[in-house]
Design a protein with these regions (language model features):
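Short intrinsically disordered, low-complexity coil segments enriched in acidic
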Residues: 1-7, 314, 439, 569
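N-terminal non-cleavable signal-anchor helices
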Residues: 5, 15, 116, 348, ...
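Mature soluble binding/inhibitory domains
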Residues: 9-380
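Sec-dependent, cleavable N-terminal signal peptides
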Residues: 1-11, 661-664
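A sequence-level detector for low-complexity, Ser/Thr- and acidic-rich stretches
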Residues: 35-41, 164-171, 175, 185, ...
Length: 664
């Protein structure tokens, strides 16, 4: 067992609490925990906590109890007992924040996550050091409480049954989807459950005729037959205020008390699946677990493209949480569903909610909920608009020292549009930016957008960002600080399509007509690689004589296609781009074993990963060349702003494999 004792009390993180009122009132909640038991990734223990939680709107909560829906802590190793009765929370203006854990064994841990437009909180304790993965969901209870009459229409559910918690084996895990058509009187008729078990790739089907359900204190109790192949026994289902989102799981007296269920009400027609969403989920991939929270963005001008961020706790491979930013794609069917190589998804509630279920052997469950729309006042720094200037990955991704950031979709940040010259100043057109209490070098300012460099001395785990315009302060925005947060600049300046990559031999741009060749060295332009040596002043250009490099071995690069697993490329150089401010350069040698055409470029640091950009490859071999830092590019001289063009990459892989065919 990795962790069986009580955790030490941790210090509460410093966080913006201006959004605490976003959690207010009585909620239903469910939290599931999974503990690794051995070096093979087998489960040693599982826990479920569920019931009612009352948020006071001011940073405190109490677990409330009734005779029929008590708050319950049930552990596969220790048995059942009650959870913590009180706790605290901090929620920022964007809905991003944390809740102290109700798990009595780990009172010092925090559940990080986000509050959606619907007031639903989803998250995970990604920063815990006690050896577990978890997922937490809380939704406000409607008043009056839901009854059978509210359970009407068609609902699609995703269910992750971790029966392996009792068996100690991932092979016992089940990932499934099913549809319930309710008539408002707790009648469902026949339902078909399809899913996957363990490491198999063959789907299973279970056809069940459900009896009538019952309601207790606003929760539905639905019972599946006890001989079900995929799911069986009682399920407690909790409803959001509008009835469009449903979640829950088995009671502690049930067949498998450690499952998690999420569901969405669907209707005919194509939903408006667009803009920003907050997400959380569980993955059981090939014998090991990870859990995550984060966000995903569907840019309006880039149809069928999803830019995703996940803050992942992956205990089997990395004991500390990591950031992953990547692309995905989708084509909604007439039933508002779509599939990738890793998961099946259903979109409902008019496009406001997406649920996901894994495809074997990649089992899992996820939920994404539409983010709140923020109302600007005064000098307004939009928390949802703070992004990596290269990748434009969603705002929940952490920042890194030396990273070039862009603040977008804000208001009254500056009087005019002004672009600085290198070295970048810390004051431009009467505008200053503070990150972690340190002045940040400014690339450009405009009324709605600013680009800055994170000072090298900024430390974490959390830093506040604030803008001052002519003496007037903006709101403060808390962000995570990583060692690295890599983002690849692209030729379209929007984080999509071909990466900003040059042939080392002549400095020409790598394009489909001028592809990279097996064996040659190319230069990739990125930001967010963190600390360098020798150090330089904030905002200064990279030196051209003694080059400033990142720590040896801290950056890795892989290249792969939809049909070829990623192949590691040799990193010849990784450090600041000579003569440019805010840009890093990675020189990589194109490895053998790739397929001709568009390939995905994977760049990772010790705590963050990016796989958004493409690199075109020719399978011809190049003459041997002497690796060297490429000539100074002109890429850093592009005007500020995000170019509005269609993405070149319609599909990129999940950070954990899979993927479709890249298209041009």
């Amino acid at each position: 067992m990795l962790a069986v004792g009580l955790a030490a009390q941790a210090q509460t993180p410093i966080w913006d609490t201006s959004g605490n009122s976003n959690l207010n009132g009585i909620y239903y909640f469910r939290q599931v925990f999974y503990f690794l038991g051995d070096a093979s990734g087998d489960l040693g223990e599982a826990t479920a906590i569920y019931g009612n939680i009352k948020f006071d709107g001011n940073g405190g909560y109490t677990l409330t109890q009734s005779t029929t829906q008590p708050w319950v802590y049930y552990d596969s190793y220790y048995g059942g007992y009650t959870a913590n009765q009180t706790g605290t929370y901090s929620i920022s203006a964007s809905g991003y924040g944390f809740i102290s854990s109700p798990n009595p064994r780990y009172p010092g841990d925090y559940i990080y996550g986000l509050v959606s437009q619907q007031g639903i909180f989803v998250g995970s304790s990604t920063e815990n050091t006690n050896g577990y993965n978890d997922m937490f969901v809380a939704a406000p209870l409607a008043s009056p409480m839901p009854t059978a009459a509210n359970f009407s229409g068609t609902y699609v559910f995703s269910d992750l049954d971790l029966v392996g918690a009792a068996q100690g084996q991932p092979a016992g895990m089940l990932s499934m989807m099913f549809t319930l058509t309710a008539d408002g009187a707790c009648h469902f008729g026949t339902t078909t459950v399809t899913g996957y078990a363990g490491t198999t790739t063959t789907p299973y089907t279970q056809i069940s005729t459900l009896p009538t359900c019952s309601f207790s204190n606003g929760a539905a109790v639905v019972t599946f037959p006890t001989n079900g192949l995929l799911t069986q026994g009682q399920k407690y289902l909790y409803f959001s205020k509008d009835g469009n989102f449903v979640f829950g799981g088995s009671p502690y007296t049930g067949y498998n008390p450690w499952d998690m269920i999420v569901g969405v009400k669907v209707s005919s027609g194509t939903p408006n699946f667009s803009d920003l969403y907050y997400q959380a989920g569980i993955d059981e991939l090939g014998g090991y677990l990870d859990t995550f929270y984060g966000s995903l963005d569907l840019p309006a001008l880039h149809p069928q493209t999803i830019m995703e961020h996940q803050r992942i706790e992956d205990l089997f491979y990395t004991p500390a949480a990591t950031d992953s930013t990547y692309l995905d794609s989708y084509t909604l069917t007439s039933g508002a569903t779509y599939s990738t190589s890793l998961a099946r998804y259903a979109v409902g509630a008019g496009g406001a909610i997406r649920i996901g279920s894994g495809i074997g052997p990649n089992l899992g469950l996820s939920v994404a909920l539409q983010a709140p729309t923020l109302t600007p006042t005064g000098v307004f720094l939009n928390p949802q608009g703070i992004v990596n200037a290269a990748s434009w990955a969603p705002f929940t991704a952490g920042i890194a020292p030396g990273e070039l950031l862009t603040f977008s979709n804000s208001s009254n940040l500056a009087a005019d549009t002004v672009v600085a010259t290198s070295p970048f100043p810390t004051s431009l057109d009467q505008v200053q930016v503070s990150i972690g209490g340190l002045p940040a070098p400014i690339y450009y300012v405009s009324p709605t957008q600013i680009s800055v460099i994170v000072p090298y001395a900024v430390t974490g785990p959390i830093a506040d960002i604030q803008v001052t315009n002519n003496g007037v302060l903006s709101n403060t925005v808390p962000v995570y600080v990583n060692q690295t947060s890599p983002g690849v600049f692209t030729q379209t300046s929007n984080g999509l399509g071909y990466g900003a990559t040059e042939h080392n031999a002549d400095g020409s741009i790598v394009t489909a007509a001028n592809p990279a060749v097996i064996g040659e060295t190319v230069a990739v332009y990125v930001t967010g690689l963190g600390a360098v040596s020798p150090t330089i002043a904030d905002g200064a250009p990279g030196p051209t004589s003694t080059l400033s490099e990142v720590p040896a071995g801290s950056v890795t690069a892989y290249i792969g296609s939809a049909t070829i697993a990623p192949v590691q490329a040799t990193v010849v150089y990784a450090g600041l781009a000579p003569a440019l401010s805010g840009l890093y350069q990675i020189d990589i040698t194109i490895p053998a074993g790739l397929t001709a055409g568009d390939n995905y470029l994977y760049i990772s640091g010790p705590d963050a990963y990016n796989s958004q950009s493409l690199i075109p490859i020719s399978t011809a071999t190049s003459a041997a060349e002497t690796p060297a830092v490429a000539p100074v590019p002109t890429l850093g001289k592009q005007p500020p702003g995000r170019l509005k063009v269609d993405p070149k990459a319609k599909r990129a892989p999940s950070p954990r494999g899979g993927g479709g065919t890249p298209k041009q």
